[in-house]
Amino acid sequence: MRKLIATVFNYSLDGLLADEGTEFWKFCFDLPENREPDDPAQLDFLQSAYAHIMGRTAYEGIAGSMTTSTDHPFADILNAGRKVVFSRTLKTADWANTTIAAGDTAEEIDKLRQGGDGHIVVWGGVSLWRSLMRLDLIDELRVSLF
């Protein structure tokens, strides 16, 4: 069974990640620590994922950053990787290799966990993390502080 691993790449001790009006995901992906990860294992972790899951808001922000990027180290991984968006309002997903999971969260996660290699990376957002935690579905939490 595949592990569900929630990642928090950008975390702040004071709770502030960006000023009001900042495009959050663009800000996150433009951080030097994310543009040039000092740990090759971070890229290996993302590359070896079976699927990358996210909520609608995170999907819209990440897709907006990664589909237009020509030089970000995460772009090739995410653009080619399998992505699943958890949303009951999103009707279409234009980002390649993306499906929408609109059913019961626990059942959708169970389907993703079945099978062989790789793990499932949870990118965000907060509503999805909360649902997954409330349902006790997260196997591991990886936090990076800058």
Predicted feature locations:
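Portal/gating segments that form or line small-molecule/metal binding sites
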Residues: M1-E140, L145-F146
